[in-house]
């Protein structure tokens, strides 16, 4: 199993390019199953989850064509099986996103209950209830969700999400694109990745309006056709590198990104003492060598502060001046990284859904273990600011969400290397 070794204490300085958003690329890839002609998706990040989704397509008889620039052409007309098997689905929660498109386009689907990061319960009941509202008959047995559309296809429905669910919104929105009649989704997720998926569906001929608000309206169409679409930049990768630079007192310029996607994060970085400039497709952060100030953070669905940036800000607060609180309202059990950071000398106290972080002058390198995707990123940041060497184990979590993380950090001057397991 690969490991990362980081020698800390170096200020990050330089320029890197931000990759396409994993959390946008995965639903967009799933949505290609709705089209009856080839679709090309560009700006895909080179990540394990993307590879797994493409491998899943191959198992189903769809043969994607990938070029050297990580664009992929998908022709779903060649699909041979409507089963998403457990051995692939178990490693990636986003595989549930093929459920809606397959039922809508082919009338049935059999998808193993998904895996992915072990963060709280993350139930799939909203996906199931949404499809049932559209007339699908669904059974959950033997670890599989077995869904069948009614004769004549799915019917448009008015569906209210009891809790805001990004993947739930995406799955039902995709299914509704080919349903008969109008669907109205209330209390829908407002995340930019949902908007990106809606834009992709509309580029294929769908009629989706309201994405980015809590009410999305979809008028079903008879067919969706191919086209070419570029995935939006990854706002969480953007935020992670900005926090890494801030924690080390450094300066970075990030290209091919969009400052409007993470205003809540930028606001907190300014509060921490960062100087930030932005353009249409770049962000520059400069700490001017200063130690950051502790900030208080409360996670909530977009456009509030994202839960996927919570762990990184705990790492920032760990070496900041003062004490900051981080309140997690989206997922339970999302402070597993705290115990690893405390082994490095951090002073973090967890009380329920709140982490109280008292900044220390420095952390000390230590062997630590990644527990989930964003927790791993926070340990990388901690390693960058720590004295001595930090060895991070189980970095397959990092590879699920960050493209070439060690190469990008090396471009910024970090001493980091991967050791094959």
From Swiss-Prot:
Question: Which residues does the record list as 2-(S-cysteinyl)pyruvic acid O-phosphothioketal (modified residue)?
Answer: 117
The UniProt keywords, alphabetically, are: Cell cycle, Cell division, Cell shape, Cell wall biogenesis/degradation, Cytoplasm, Peptidoglycan synthesis, Pyruvate, Transferase
Question: What is the protein's name according to its record?
Answer: UDP-N-acetylglucosamine 1-carboxyvinyltransferase
Q: Which GO terms describe its cellular component?
A: cytoplasm
Name the family. Belongs to the EPSP synthase family. MurA subfamily.
Q: Which NCBIfam families match?
A: murA (TIGR01072), PRK09369.1 (NF006873)
Protein source organism:
Stutzerimonas stutzeri (strain A1501) (Pseudomonas stutzeri)
Q: In which pathway does it act?
A: Cell wall biogenesis; peptidoglycan biosynthesis
Catalytic residues (positions): 117
Q: Which amino acid positions bind UDP-N-acetyl-alpha-D-glucosamine, per UniProt? A: 93, 122-126, 308, 330
Enzyme class per UniProt: transferase
Which parts form a coiled-coil structure per UniProt?
none
| Catalytic reaction annotation | phosphoenolpyruvate + UDP-N-acetyl-alpha-D-glucosamine = UDP-N-acetyl-3-O-(1-carboxyvinyl)-alpha-D-glucosamine + phosphate
**GO process terms (BP):** cell division; cell wall organization; peptidoglycan biosynthetic process; regulation of cell shape; UDP-N-acetylgalactosamine biosynthetic process
């Amino acid at each position: 199993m690969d490991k990362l070794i980081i020698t800390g204490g170096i200020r990050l300085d330089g320029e890197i390019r931000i990759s396409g958003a994993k959390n946008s690329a995965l639903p967009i890839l799933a949505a290609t199953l709705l089209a009856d002609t080839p679709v090309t998706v560009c700006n895909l990040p080179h990540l394990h989850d993307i590879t797994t989704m493409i491998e899943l397509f191959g198992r189903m008889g769809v043969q994607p064509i990938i070029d050297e620039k990580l664009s992929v052409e998908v022709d779903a007309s060649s699909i041979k099986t409507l089963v998403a098997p457990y051995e692939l689905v178990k490693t990636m929660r986003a595989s549930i996103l093929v459920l809606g498109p397959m039922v809508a386009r082919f009338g049935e689907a059999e998808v193993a209950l998904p895996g992915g990061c072990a963060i709280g319960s993350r139930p799939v009941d909203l996906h199931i209830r949404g499809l049932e509202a559209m007339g699908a008959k669904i059974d959950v047995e033997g670890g599989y969700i077995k869904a069948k559309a009614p004769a004549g296809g799915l019917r448009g429905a008015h569906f209210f999400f009891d809790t805001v669910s990004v993947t739930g919104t995406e799955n039902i929105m995709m299914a509704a694109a080919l349903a008969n009649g109008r669907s109205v989704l209330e209390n829908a997720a407002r995340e930019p990745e949902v908007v990106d998926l809606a834009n992709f569906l509309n580029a294929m001929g769908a009629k989706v309006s309201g994405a980015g608000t809590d009410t999305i309206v979809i008028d079903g169409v008879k067919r969706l056709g191919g086209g070419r679409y570029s995935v939006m930049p990854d706002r969480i990768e953007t935020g992670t590198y900005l926090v890494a630079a801030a924690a080390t007192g450094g300066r970075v310029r990030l290209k091919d990104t969009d400052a409007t996607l993470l205003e809540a994060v930028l606001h907190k970085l300014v509060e921490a003492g960062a100087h930030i400039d932005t353009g249409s497709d770049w962000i520059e952060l400069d700490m001017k060598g200063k130690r950051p100030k502790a900030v208080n953070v409360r996670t909530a669905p977009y456009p509030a502060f994202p839960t996927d940036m919570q762990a990184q800000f705990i790492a920032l607060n760990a070496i900041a001046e003062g004490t900051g609180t981080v309140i997690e309202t989206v997922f339970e059990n999302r402070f597993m990284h705290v115990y690893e950071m405390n082994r490095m000398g951090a002073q973090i106290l967890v009380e329920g859904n709140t982490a109280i972080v008292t900044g220390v002058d420095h952390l000390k390198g230590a062997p630590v273990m990644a527990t989930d995707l964003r927790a791993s990123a926070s340990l990388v940041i901690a390693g960058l600011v720590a004295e001595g060497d930090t060895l991070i184990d189980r970095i397959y979590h990092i590879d699920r969400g960050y493209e070439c993380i060690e190469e990008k950090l090396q471009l910024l001057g970090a001493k980091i290397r991967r050791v094959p397991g």
